[in-house]
A protein has these predicted regions:
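Rossmann-like dinucleotide-binding core of oxidoreductases
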Residues: 194-276
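N-terminal Rossmann-fold NAD(P) dinucleotide-binding loop
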Residues: 50
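Beta1/beta-strand and adjacent pyrophosphate-binding region of the FAD-binding site
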Residues: 35-47
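Conserved beta-strand-loop-beta-strand element in the redox core of flavoprotein oxidoreductases
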Residues: 160-179
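Conserved N-terminal/central alpha/beta ligand/cofactor-binding core
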Residues: 9, 23-30, 56, 62-63, ...
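Core beta-strand elements of the Rossmann-like FAD/NAD(P) dinucleotide-binding domain
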Residues: 37-39, 175-184
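Short hydrophobic core segments
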Residues: 44, 180-191
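Intrinsically disordered, low-complexity segments enriched in serine/proline and basic residues
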Residues: 1-6, 13
Length: 276
């Protein structure tokens, strides 16, 4: 069979040349204009850790910049998830052991009146279920009230170093490449982006041992909540086992689901994808 020639777009070729040692692209990045004056703290990533870091630094009087690649704050907690765990101890009688900024976030969510506190299916303590859009608003309100400068739709492309110290990050924005300079940088990207670009020690998932596949969940609509409440976890797992034994291809025979802040909508954690 004859091989087909594949035409690679010029934009991709340009990136490949740069990655292969062509310095032209890198020089263009280093010469990118400053997005704002020097910050005391620059945080990359606005998930729970990044937004908390930015908020804590700003409350201590630092001039803080928060960079987020999405068009909203919150990272995975607003893009995918709907429940906080870790505020309470495991067991039947949960004790609250986390406060601080976590409390501030939950208090702000409660003002929006769509918060459900519920027990974990496996006894891991109370969970705090929220509406993702409410959490987007809560984080935005809190960081702006603290005086944090927020830049959305910013993707880190590189860093500028001086004697192994990060001086600025190069970001791709809607207006093109730009630099953000700071005295201290916090990598809350979730992917160790700053570590990678700066050459700092880091671990690549799956390089030395199997990496767990990302958790894949889905939501079910039009669920009869009263009927669902009558079905306990033991019955659910038993039904899944019987279905698998009858020939239904189920990669996982246990799991859980929970009510959300929207009537008739339940979230599940019941799928499994083989690690590779």
């Amino acid at each position: 069979m004859a091989r087909r020639a594949i035409r690679i777009p010029s934009e991709i070729l340009q990136v490949l040349r740069w990655l292969n040692g062509n310095t032209t692209g890198r020089l263009a990045m280093i010469n990118a204009p400053m997005l704002a004056p020097l910050f005391d703290v620059v945080v990359v990533g606005s998930g729970s850790s990044g937004a908390s870091a930015a908020l804590a630094a700003a409350r201590e009087g630092a001039k803080v910049c928060l960079l987020e690649r999405s068009s909203f704050l919150g990272g995975t907690s607003t893009a995918v998830l709907d429940t906080f765990y870790g505020f309470y101890t495991p067991g039947v009688h949960s004790l609250k052991v986390v406060g601080g900024i976590g409390d501030d976030v939950v208090d702000r969510l409660k003002k929006l009146d769509r918060v459900v506190e519920r027990p974990n299916s496996y006894g891991a303590g109370l969970g705090i279920t929220y509406h993702p859009d409410d959490l987007k608003c809560a984080w935005e309100q809190l960081v702006l009230e603290a005086g944090v400068t927020v830049f959305l739709n910013c993707w880190v492309q590189d860093v500028q170093l001086d004697s192994d110290c990060i001086m600025s990050v190069i970001v791709a924005t809607k207006r093109g490449l730009a630099q953000v300079a700071g005295r201290t940088f916090v990598d809350a990207s979730g992917d160790a982006d700053l570590c990678f670009w700066s050459g700092s020690p880091h671990v690549t998932a799956g390089e030395h041992e199997e990496a767990q596949s990302l958790t894949t969940t889905f939501r079910m609509c039009n669920v009869d909540a009263i009927t669902r409440k009558a079905v306990d976890l033991e019955y659910l797992h038993s039904a899944m086992t019987k279905a698998a034994e009858a020939g239904y291809a189920l990669p996982r025979r246990e799991g859980s689901d929970h009510a959300t802040t929207v009537d008739g909508v339940f979230a599940t954690n019941i799928t499994r994808i083989q690690s590779f």
